[in-house]
């Protein structure tokens, strides 16, 4: 990297640090931002000036004085850009369609709705997002959660919506609309959402096992803020685990999983495998199928194979909508491109 390129990269990192600091507070003084981002006061002043000129940052009223000179306060401009968060939902018992939320840069929900659809075609998804962006020109980034696998270029492999197989909404929408688009597996978004919504004062890891009614199960893991996606982003596809016993074939076991039949042994096996391979601090058991499961039955089974001192904290939570949306928003905001 050239000296000029290195300086440019450093500047972008510093701008990102300032934005991240402002995302997580209502306002801050220049001195507070400089200290938090480990910048000199002069560098912080110059960068804030550029961000103010671009509209990213707002100058607020002076802070109350404690006898000295009052300090100017700064805040992120929540309406500099809006983010469209959506995911494809498919559950034979509940509902199928597209769940969406539009947020400002602070994460405040501006609009939320569910659009029922029996099937989702590529043109449906493209038209739907295009209409949303046309209705709100401030939408500059879109995060799309998929019930299935997405590759590193954004192409979809979905069993829930076969018509989307091979479709790359990221490529199509970025070319057509000139906005930032990310696509990701549902459990990768969701596990990151759990991580964001369960902050800790030290690095930690968590895994999420998701058992919906009438759909195949999935899993996601975050270690120290990093999602474990795997080399081809196939990590977490529980349907590929050898969840069989002496009386059931693989096909029969998968059918049981999808139809919610005799689900406890499958959850127990998946939990043991997750703990043995990933050793998370926290293991979330989620999805509507957990409503009829006792947490104690899973824990007792795990203790038969996992030493007590290596057992995670177990938490059970049926609904994951808020975590899913939080993960989509957080990762899409990270990907949003700025002029400065």
Could you describe each region identified by the protein language model?
Residues 1-112, 120-131, 138, 245-340:
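ATP-binding/phosphotransfer module of carbohydrate and carboxylate kinases, centering on a glycine-rich
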Residues 83-87, 141-143, 205-210, 218:
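Short glycine-aspartate micro-motif
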Residues 102, 149, 220-221:
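Hydrophobic beta-strand positions
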Residues 109-197, 202, 297-305:
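Glycine-rich phosphate-binding loop and adjoining helix at the ATP-binding site
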Residues 112, 176-275:
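Glycine/GP-enriched mid-protein hinge/lid loop-to-helix segment characteristic of carbohydrate kinases
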Residues 147-149, 214, 289-290:
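Short glycine-rich anion-binding loops that position phosphate/pyrophosphate groups of nucleotides
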């Amino acid at each position: 990297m050239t000296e000029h390129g290195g300086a440019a990269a450093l500047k972008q990192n510093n701008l990102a640090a300032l934005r991240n600091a402002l995302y997580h507070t209502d306002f801050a003084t220049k001195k507070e931002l400089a200290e938090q981002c480990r910048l000199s006061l002069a560098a912080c002043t110059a960068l804030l000036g550029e961000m103010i000129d671009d509209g990213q940052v707002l100058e607020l009223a002076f802070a109350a004085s404690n006898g000295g000179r009052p300090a100017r306060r700064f805040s992120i401009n929540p309406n500099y850009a809006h983010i469209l968060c959506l995911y494809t939902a498919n559950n034979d018992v509940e509902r199928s369609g597209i769940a969406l939320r539009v947020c400002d840069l602070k994460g405040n929900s501006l609009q939320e709705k569910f659009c029922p659809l029996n099937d989702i075609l590529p043109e449906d998804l493209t038209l739907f997002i295009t209409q949303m962006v046309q209705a709100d020109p401030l939408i500059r980034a879109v995060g799309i959660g998929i019930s299935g696998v997405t590759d590193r270029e954004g192409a979809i492999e979905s069993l829930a919506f076969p018509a989307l197989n091979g479709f790359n909404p990221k490529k199509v929408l970025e070319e057509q609309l000139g906005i930032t688009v990310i696509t990701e597996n549902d459990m990768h978004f969701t596990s990151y959402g759990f991580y964001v919504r369960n902050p800790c004062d030290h690095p930690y890891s968590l895994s999420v096992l998701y058992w919906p009614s009438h759909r195949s199960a999935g899993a996601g893991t975050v270690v120290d803020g990093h999602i474990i996606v795997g080399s081809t982003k196939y990590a977490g596809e529980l349907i590929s685990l050898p969840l069989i016993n002496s009386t059931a074939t693989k096909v029969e076991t998968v059918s049981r999983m999808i139809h919610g039949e005799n689900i406890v042994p499958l959850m127990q096996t998946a939990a043991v495998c997750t703990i043995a391979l990933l050793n998370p601090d926290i293991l979330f058991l989620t999805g509507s199928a957990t409503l009829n499961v006792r947490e104690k039955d899973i824990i007792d089974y795990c203790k038969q194979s996992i030493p007590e001192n290596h057992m995670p904290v177990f938490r059970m939570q049926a609904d994951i909508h808020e975590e899913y949306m939080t993960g989509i928003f957080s990762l899409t905001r990270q990907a949003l491109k700025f002029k400065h």
